[in-house]
Amino acid sequence: MDLFKFFSKQSSKDVAKERLKLILIQDRNSISPDVLESIREDMLKVISKYIEIDNEDVDIKMSSVEEIEGMSPALIASIPIKRIKKK
């Protein structure tokens, strides 16, 4: 693992390539941005019942993961936790 590469910024070419991949994945899975936003809102509402989260830094996107049969769609969520709520 190259530690210097880990801390370096992505080039605009790499960012554009990653965005295009995400658009293609969303298109192939027939999930519109509106539906993805609805999923995001619903997930955050449920999670917020139990955990205090940082809504500003939430990142939810469609991706793909390699399965035995090939590539499968995946919903990837990065949700920063501030603290666990007590009942």
Curated annotation (Swiss-Prot):
Disulfide bonds: none annotated. Keywords: Cell cycle, Cell division. Prevents the cell division inhibition by proteins MinC and MinD at internal division sites while permitting inhibition at polar sites. This ensures cell division at the proper site by restricting the formation of a division septum at the midpoint of the long axis of the cell. It comes from Clostridium botulinum (strain Hall / ATCC 3502 / NCTC 13319 / Type A). GO terms for biological process: division septum site selection; regulation of division septum assembly. The keyword Cell cycle applies. GO terms for cellular component: plasma membrane. InterPro entries: MinE, MinE_sf. This is Cell division topological specificity factor. SUPFAM superfamilies: Cell division protein MinE topological specificity domain (SSF55229). It comes from the Bacteria. Belongs to the MinE family.
